[in-house]
Amino acid sequence: TTTAGTGSEVDQWGVVTNPATNEKIGCGGMDSLFPTLAVVDPELMATVPAKFTAYQGFDALFHSTEGFISKANSLMSDMVQLAAIENVGKYLARAVRDGSDMEAREHMAFANTMSGYSMVVGACTSEHAMEHAMSAYHGDLPHGAGLIMISKEYYTHFVNKHCCDDRFIRMAKALG
């Protein structure tokens, strides 16, 4: 993988975009779509521009935060999601500031892989689907940027409903 965000190197999900119809549809879920081999080399990520490092990092973060607050959670999903959240919290800013920081790139690659795997052992919530609709209509909108745009209102809704306060506290601690 050349970026740290989608986690697609370890899951069986993808997105198909049809710009002619403004559709962006998630597809997959079949065992036959699991990758056979994943090469996750942080050195390949060293030249990714800072803003795309940030967008991809937030994509990885939101895969895990969505999964962590979803009802489809387990000990396994909690473990990989919290590992991803912790690594994003500690290393994303460093990777954005200095793309050649290999320690930060390595930890972001790990966070990305764990976030991808979190979709195998858990699930995303509706935030990703909502963003797909946005970037389907606005083809120049990077996916991670769209997620950032809606994240405050999205997560505020769950906080105000007090539906998973303990999970938000655990995520905040993991983020540092």
Model-inferred region functions:
Residues 68-74, 122, 156-166:
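Short helix-capping/linker segments at secondary-structure and domain boundaries
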Residues 39-45, 88-97, 129-135:
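Short amphipathic alpha-helical segments and their helix-coil junctions
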Residues 137-140, 144-176:
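Gly/Pro-rich interdomain helix-loop hinge
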